[in-house]
């Protein structure tokens, strides 16, 4: 059952258990109804709401069984979107529950696979990261196992370790961007900076820009002044264009 924060049932969802199950999507769920608006619902919120507020932490996982696995492993702030991507309305809901009033007094942790789809999902979150006044992190399992599979194969400690190994979202995005280039070559470093520059120019909170510049210079291994010049050049080039265009990962199929 999919419940709201008041524990009223809004719909139902399930996960495909076996690869040969006759279901085209990994997750299936109730279509939208007048009372079930997927962009306003987070699975597991009835269990996690109080702890999200108490701990100023929210762990965003992919699906229903990941929420179950996280809670069984002691991660009692885990929730998931239902049949849709995590969006702006979900972010505002989390922010309200955490009680943020503009200071960095909490953390939102997204779990992603380490594959290309996971990287695209991280980029999509980065684009909307300024919605959160909390600090945003990414927890990635290199083997590609989700929390449910981790629990079944390695036990609850592995799920807790996944969350504990979280890294800042901006670092994950920048490292994945520059990893496509040969940083042992001068032209490779310049190309990496130019590829990552739109990430910096997309930041709406200008008080964060200097820290991002320094982080990028450390990741690439070059002088921060060079990074600053390239970012300024990119900003001038794209001043009249959208700040950052990212192709989002495919939306989960709805049942």
Task: Describe each region flagged by the PLM.
Residues 1-104, 122:
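Phosphate-handling DNA/RNA-contact segment within nucleic-acid enzymes
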Residues 5, 49-57, 72, 87-255:
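A charged alpha-helical hairpin associated with nucleic-acid processing machineries
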């Amino acid at each position: 059952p999919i419940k709201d924060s008041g524990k009223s049932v809004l719909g139902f969802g399930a996960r495909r258990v076996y690869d040969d199950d006759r279901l085209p999507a990994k997750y299936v769920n109730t279509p939208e109804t007048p009372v079930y608006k997927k962009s306003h619902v987070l699975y597991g919120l009835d269990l996690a709401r109080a702890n999200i507020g108490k701990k100023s932490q929210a762990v965003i996982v992919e699906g229903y069984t990941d929420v179950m696995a996280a809670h069984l492993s002691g991660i009692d702030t885990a929730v998931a979107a239902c049949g849709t991507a995590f969006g702006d309305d979900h972010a505002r809901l989390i922010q309200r529950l955490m009680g943020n009033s503009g200071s960095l007094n909490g953390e939102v942790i997204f779990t992603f696979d380490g594959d290309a789809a996971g990287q695209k999902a991280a980029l999509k979150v980065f684009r909307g990261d300024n919605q959160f006044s909390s600090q945003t992190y990414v927890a990635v399992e290199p083997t590609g196992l989700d929390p449910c599979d981790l629990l079944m194969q390695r036990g609850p400690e592995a799920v807790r370790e996944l969350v504990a190994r979280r890294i800042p979202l901006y670092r994950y995005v920048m490292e994945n961007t520059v990893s496509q280039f040969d940083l042992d070559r001068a032209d490779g470093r310049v190309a990496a900076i130019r590829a990552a520059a739109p990430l910096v120019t997309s930041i709406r909170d200008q008080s964060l820009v200097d820290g991002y510049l320094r982080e990028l210079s450390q990741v690439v291994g070059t002088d921060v002044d060079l990074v600053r010049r390239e970012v300024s050049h990119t900003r001038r080039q794209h001043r009249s264009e959208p700040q950052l265009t990212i192709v989002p990962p495919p939306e989960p199929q709805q049942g």
